Amino acid sequence: MRTTLLKFVLLFSLVLLNTSLSTGQIQYNNIRFKQLSIAEGLPHNTINAITQDNHGFIWFGTRNGLCRYDGYNINLFAHNEADSTSLRHNFITRLYNDSLRNILWISTDQGICSYNYETEDFSRYQIKGNTKDDVCFLNTSDGVLLAACSNGLYRYNEQDSLFVPFLLDEEKPHVRYLAEDGDKTLWIDTNKGLMRYSLEKKQFVSLPTLIQPFTLQCNNAALISSNQLLFNTNNDFFVYHIQSNTLCNLSKDLEVKDFRCAATDHTGNIWVGTEYGIFVFNKLYQLIAHYEQSERDLSALNDSPIYSLYQDKAHNMWVGTYFGGVNYYIFGSDQFQIYPYGASFNHLSGKAVRQIINAPDNGLYIATEDGGLNYLNNKKEITRAERLHKQMQIYAKNIHSLWLDKDNSLWLGLFLKGALHYIPHLNRTVDYNLLSDEVSSGFCIIEDKNDHIWYGGPSGLFLIDKKKANSRPEKISSLRVFNLVQFNDSILWAGTRKGSIFQINTHTLKVTSLPILPHTDLYITYIYPDSHQRIWIGTDNNGLYVSDRNGSIIAFYSKEQLGSNAIKGIIEDEMSNVWVGTGNGLCCINSQAGSIDRYTTADGLPINQFNYSSACKKPDGELYFGTINGMISFYPEQVRSVNPRFNIALTAIWSNSEYMSPNNEKAFIPSSISELTEITLTHEQAQSLRLEYSGLNYQYTDNTQYAMKMEGIDKDWQFVGNQHQVRFSNLPSGRYILKIKASKDGIHWDETGQKDLAIRVLPPWWLSPGAYLVYALLFLLIIYAAYRYTKTRIILLMRLKTEHEQRVNIENMNQQKINFFTYISHDLKTPLTLILSPLQLSLIHI
């Protein structure tokens, strides 16, 4: 069966190629899949359903839980017997994003439930009489949510949060699928056949004549666009075009006769998921691609049985498999054709691709540093080194440079083994290393107008005279030459290491220095004259310079613009754009528009690091670049210049190592983390705060660059690279605004997807308004106490003073009395003495 399928893929490969080249959109023969499995955090590798919510998160329904993917982490939601607000059951059968109500509907093996984004919990629902729990949801064009289940159709009553009957007849058929076409007609797939219901007329309408014979045989259906119905019978699967009233049997030439799921990509082509992989049909219903599991190709599907297909808002295709978890194709990753290294058919024999040159028969010679010489014909079939080396008598595998001379003879520059000359019409190879007395390397090789072959490397610059048979290589200079280019009929330019650029007169063999560059310690890797009389000079340590023919620098491109200071290869396309392979991606420079587009692994490159002197343009305009892990080719007009959109969302908040959510009693989260615009923190919570976030761009997840600014702390934007979390410690009380924005390259920033989060940090209890009130009351109390104390003291002092004064007065009065009586007694004593004395004398004499 697989052999037959392969034949059909090959049969339609020409159609596929023409389609991809003419549309310039998806190159289906170059699609590569990435994978998410248990190793990345999935709870189960069987994926029954996939959808994307309003925020941009991708949801996976597995056999063991519900998962939310943000590009970095997989967040698992599982059933908990003790929690009625948890997921109803871990076996998920369908997912539906209700964009009108911002609700995720989940059909499980034990009934349905919905995920509430504001509270981050689940609500459970009952549909009376539903015996089978595979429920299909649909929002009609009128905004009515319908549920198709085992006993008919039900409508969601939003006010009462209940499902009520809709279009139920007495027989109550099992409705397996429900969809609305562009004419506001419902297509209803039931166990009793296919039906149609007009929402405008509010009545059932007859089926088109073409599909009436199949209605009772239909056992699976899917409306893959507003005008195309895919349905499966016992023997085949068909697509019915509603508008044109045409029917096509997609499986007539296939051994596969049924499908499980289907979706359309942004071009309108149909992806059909089957037990034997994915079949892609174009708008003419011709098979143009087949993807299945491959043990030899890691970028193929890792499992063939397909259970779900989904196209997200960015045109990425998500594939749910039975054993392989999630496979996904990133839109745009197909624009570069990859020629990988490996032992398999049509793989390069070497990993590090060095120089690539055009061959006489519209093919390419490809030099590798670790696998010898390869040849690519015009059908893009690779002849490996094992065969070529035997034919050409080549013994070395480390080939650094190639040159096809005027006679169509091939010259090879080798590492530490000089140069080889292969003469096709004689089938003879001349080894110039055997003719030389000095060890040399051919890092670059070129022919001048005088039939001289020049090659150079770390050990110097050498000359071979083709006119002389078995001519010994002549050492012209000890310069460490890494690049040679013909400037005019008699002048070569040589790029050297730590010696800048030198000019070589091919007649006089004189070598002179050219003071073009601002530094003399630059490692010149590539010199390229374009069609506008400009000389592009690449360095390995200081970016890219552009000179005019007079040697004046007219432009300079640095790491900030190119993503790397290491320039590996330069080539001009048919539109005068200059493509530059660097140590960190591929750049397209439009000097007229002043723009630079940079491409990385997120855009489909196999690796970001290109190799030296490895750029070539074929006569039809296709460009080839060598990397340290294989080779790529592309047509520049088909490469999309994309300024990706980001929608930054918070994915997790941690305070003092505790995860915060609306369901956490200690949390400060009033609603879903992803919907937060403002948070309030206590002093304790602000002591250690960690916020995780994602740009929700699944193409540039690994390369997304972030910048943030904390208004209230930062004056300028802080560029944090691909770090997708931020930590704060001991935030002082106050109000802040955290701003986060994203970019694919750190140069072009998407301001529209910026996230602003207002953060309010409450003061500690001893600095809170209540504390200040207490402090004020205490202060007033102290003032009052001081006042009372002072007043009491004053009164006491006054009383004491009064008592003292009274006592003094009494003492004074007593003293005055004593003095008075003393004076009186004195005054009385004197006369009495005068009276008594005579009396006493009288008495004595009596």
Per-region residue spans from a language model:
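Residue-level "micro-hotspots" composed of small/polar
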Residues: 23-58, 79-93, 129-130, 170-173, ...
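Trp- and S/T/G-rich repeat-edge/linker motifs of beta-rich repeat architectures
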Residues: 31-37, 74-77, 120-128, 161-169, ...
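Residue-level detector of Asp-centered blade-edge/turn motifs that repeat once per structural unit
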Residues: 52-55, 97-101, 139-142, 180-183, ...
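Conserved beta-propeller blade signature
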Residues: 57-59, 103-105, 145-146, 186-187, ...
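Loop/turn residues immediately N-terminal
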Residues: 64-66, 110-113, 151-154, 192-195, ...
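Short loop/turn segments that connect beta-strands within beta-propeller blades
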Residues: 70-73, 116-120, 157-161, 198-202, ...
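Coil residues (strongly favoring Ser/Thr
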Residues: 84, 99, 122, 160-161, ...
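Primarily the dimerization/phosphotransfer
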Residues: 799-843
